Amino acid sequence: KENLLYHTGINTEKLFEVLVKQISAGLLFQKNTDHTDSDLKRLQESAEQKAIDFITFLPEMRRILSTDVTAMYNGDPAAQNKAEVILCYPAIRAICNYRIAHKLLELDVPLIPRIITEMAHSETGIDIHPGAVIGEYFAIDHGTGVVIGATSVIGNRVKLYQGVTLGARSFPLDENNNPIKGIARHPIIEDDVIIYSNATILGRITIGKGAVIGGNIWVTENVAPGERLVQA
């Protein structure tokens, strides 16, 4: 037990050092101007506090990720055990990267969250924006081609299959014909929803609790709780 606590402490210190370095780099990139010594000191202090807040959240993140593993295992009869899910399933890699990135984004860390999710995107073919809000017991089966947009909101016990897109419709433009940033433009997926392969759900619509969306469907309007939307 003492050895475990010792090694945990050592690794936590190493993690803190890495986090501070990376968060500082992100903050410097965001400012993109010359810095005085006092600016750099404040930036360093900010990076250290964000690193502390992130590390403090790790036990809760581990708990949430364990629910995702459980959902993947329970939903896939081919899974022999949870260790197989953790080590072999690309969706777990993508979800893990997302949950790390999302917390960093909540802490106002620039750039780094997007890098983390794009690493998983390039490795798994699963594109989850760090700005999305995703509940517990989240499962993605197979996963290749899944896209989850920045303002998507996903409840608990939701399952997606490969090729699902939670995207936006046409963007409203400002007076200079540039897309207006920061508006909610992606779907809300309530608890216990299943969305089958290659379904495309666009715009700020709501897919109600317990609904089932069949494969290869294009959805741009609200779906009532418990509704089954399938091709004829």
Where would I find each of the regions flagged by the language model?
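Terminal amphipathic alpha-helical/low-complexity segments used for targeting or macromolecular assembly
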Residues: K1-I115
